[in-house]
């Protein structure tokens, strides 16, 4: 089973951002995405929105962009159109990695054959997917580069997750995790960490096996945390919890863009890309999901360890010259701002401890969507 990879001549960028609707009185999720899509399509036909797995969610999707500021500006414009539609229905926009108390039984799945198939196959766990994320696409020039870069990106998995983690609560309980979304999503049979394939042919062989065994027939595709998007000629990084605001999204997209281009240029220079044993990658994923920005992570094949905050500061300094070249230096600097402000999970947990109510945490995320704006 050969898979054609639509090669991208330059490291273009695309971003998908999942946003939910909430009732301002109950703070619970509101399954009214179909109405929102209709209003936006009528009033702002230039805005690209997609319906999502849940009827309470819409996805903002950029076009093909060359820079982080371009992608963020497009998302900002689309967010304004989405807010206008939500206001007209008396709803608020909200997003984080997961909702702190909503009941999956009150949140219907969108009407789509592939969604029905996923629920039929995965049952309880499929119904639990009250989760939201950010997907970042970066263009790759040749399929032979895809898996070396993905395997290198897996060494940065905990950095991206800790920075974005915003799902500390579930079913009204503090889970003790920074990203409960991460723990939930990996319950689906085609989700979670990718295998560290060593070549494009090996990936094609794997996908042929999944097709022959009926796995792809059931799910439509593999939903790995980082995966090739052959149709677009990109690597799609799906690690991050959804951020409650464009400002933090900007930082995560900038870091992702810089990392992919950095590893691509290492290939150009004939340098060996970093990698970790699969068990180290898995452990790092768990540590970042559990401890967020307080995680101590494994940084070498010799099992050396460091604090993820220190590693993030090191990465920002290392990547800053490249960020200047790519036009996203200011956005990359926002990584340091997140470290100072505290992660989304920390802010939600803090307001819950102050008020004793997860409704206040929902309000916080709604307010941040309005107040923590992208850079001018």
Curated annotation (Swiss-Prot):
<dbReference type="Pfam" id="PF04107">
    <property type="entry name" value="GCS2"/>
</dbReference>
<dbReference type="InterPro" id="IPR050141">
    <property type="entry name" value="GCL_type2/YbdK_subfam"/>
</dbReference>
<comment type="function">
    <text>ATP-dependent carboxylate-amine ligase which exhibits weak glutamate--cysteine ligase activity.</text>
</comment>
<dbReference type="GO" id="GO:0005524">
    <property type="term" value="F:ATP binding"/>
</dbReference>
<dbReference type="InterPro" id="IPR006336">
    <property type="entry name" value="GCS2"/>
</dbReference>
<keyword id="KW-0436">Ligase</keyword>
<dbReference type="GO" id="GO:0042398">
    <property type="term" value="P:modified amino acid biosynthetic process"/>
</dbReference>
<protein>
    <recommendedName>
        <fullName>Putative glutamate--cysteine ligase 2</fullName>
        <ecNumber>6.3.2.2</ecNumber>
    </recommendedName>
</protein>
<comment type="similarity">
    <text>Belongs to the glutamate--cysteine ligase type 2 family. YbdK subfamily.</text>
</comment>
<dbReference type="InterPro" id="IPR011793">
    <property type="entry name" value="YbdK"/>
</dbReference>
<keyword id="KW-0067">ATP-binding</keyword>
<dbReference type="InterPro" id="IPR014746">
    <property type="entry name" value="Gln_synth/guanido_kin_cat_dom"/>
</dbReference>
<dbReference type="GO" id="GO:0004357">
    <property type="term" value="F:glutamate-cysteine ligase activity"/>
</dbReference>
<keyword id="KW-0547">Nucleotide-binding</keyword>
